[in-house]
């Protein structure tokens, strides 16, 4: 099992898709990293040699991106700042409602939680 930046990569996936398990790396940046590390895109995670793993680790450290814990902390601080300045987006985050203008009269179930049933009117 390959471990990069504190993340265990899945065993039998192509390396480009395995790198997307690292928070902050999408498929496009994963392909660029693989290209810079001079690794074939068809290589599976199990088939990586130690030299290739070291090359991947070096590329991940050399790119100027926030990854994993740093990125999560950065996003958390941004949400905390929105809450502190009491703006509309901060209030939506605080109340666990959709932030980007989606409707809430119907839908938005994943953000608002499961349905709260109300008993019907008795006759």
Swiss-Prot record:
In residue numbers, the region (Disordered) covers 90-123
The answer to whether UniProt assigns keyword Ribosomal protein to this entry is yes
**What superkingdom heads the lineage?**
Eukaryota
The record, for Pfam families, names: Ribosomal_S13 (PF00416)
- List the Gene3D superfamilies hit by this protein, alphabetically: 1.10.8.50, 30s ribosomal protein s13, domain 2
InterPro entries noted in UniProt: Rbsml_uS13_C, Ribosomal_uS13, Ribosomal_uS13-like_H2TH, Ribosomal_uS13_bac-type, Ribosomal_uS13_CS
Q: What is its main location?
A: plastid
Its GO biological process annotations read: translation
> Can you provide one Gene Ontology molecular function annotated for this UniProt record?
structural constituent of ribosome
Q: Mind telling me which GO cellular component terms the entry cites?
A: chloroplast; mitochondrion; small ribosomal subunit
Report the locations given in the UniProt record: Plastid, Chloroplast
Keyword list, A-Z: Chloroplast, Plastid, Ribonucleoprotein, Ribosomal protein, RNA-binding, rRNA-binding
Compositional bias (Basic residues): 102-123
> Whom does it interact with, and what assembly results?
Part of the 30S ribosomal subunit.
The entry's function note states: Located at the top of the head of the 30S subunit, it contacts several helices of the 16S rRNA.
Q: Which protein family is named in the record?
A: Belongs to the universal ribosomal protein uS13 family.
> Could you identify this protein by its name?
Small ribosomal subunit protein uS13c
Q: Which organism is it from?
A: Trieres chinensis (Marine centric diatom)
Gene it is expressed from = rps13
